[in-house]
Every structure is written in structure tokens, then in C-alpha cells.
Swiss-Prot record:
Selective antagonist of neuronal tetrodotoxin (TTX)-sensitive voltage-gated sodium channels (IC(50)=1270 nM on Nav1.1/SCN1A, 270 nM on Nav1.2/SCN2A, 491 nM on Nav1.3/SCN3A and 232 nM on Nav1.7/SCN9A). This toxin suppress Nav1.7 current amplitude without significantly altering the activation, inactivation, and repriming kinetics. Short extreme depolarizations partially activate the toxin-bound channel, indicating voltage-dependent inhibition of this toxin. This toxin increases the deactivation of the Nav1.7 current after extreme depolarizations. The keyword Secreted applies. This is Hainantoxin-III 5. The keyword Signal applies. The presence of a 'disulfide through disulfide knot' structurally defines this protein as a knottin. GO terms for cellular component: extracellular region; host cell presynaptic membrane. Residues 1-21 form the signal peptide. Monomer. SUPFAM superfamilies: omega toxin-like. InterPro entries: Huwentoxin-1, Huwentoxin_CS1. It comes from Cyriopagopus hainanus (Chinese bird spider). It is found in: Secreted. The modification Leucine amide is found at L81.
Amino acid sequence: MKASRFLALAGLVLLFVVGYASESEEKEFPRELLSKIFAVDDFKGEERGCKGFGDSCTPGKNECCPNYACSSKHKWCKVYLGK
């Protein structure tokens, strides 16, 4: 559900960028705008304090995010369904 919302929002943003760039009179503007949007050189991701689905973990430690548990068999965070 969240993924479909994200994809819809990303599609709308991309549509807006393309529409705005096509209306621009400068020929270099679309290329500059897209290069700034998709530039990953300056992007430094924030590290989370917990591990998400599929991340490796150590059983017995509380490393996984809420609603996830460290699988003692596979040694990665999985969805905790409770018992």
C-alpha cells in the first residue's frame, strides 16, 4: 500500500518536472534540472538506529526496528507476527 502511494507520488513529481521543463525557453534547463534532481554525489543517507526487513542481525540483541524480530535460524530481521 505504501509502495503504491510512493510510486504515484513519484510519478506526479516526474510529470510536474517534465511539464515544467518543457515549458522553459532555455534549452539547457531540462538537463540541468534533471541532473540536480538525480545527483547522488552530495546525497548522504541518514542511518537508522534500527535494522529493517532483510538486514543481518544478531539473535538476542534488539537491533531490528519495531514490528521486526531477528530470526535465530536465518540471522536477519523479519516481520514479527507474535504468538
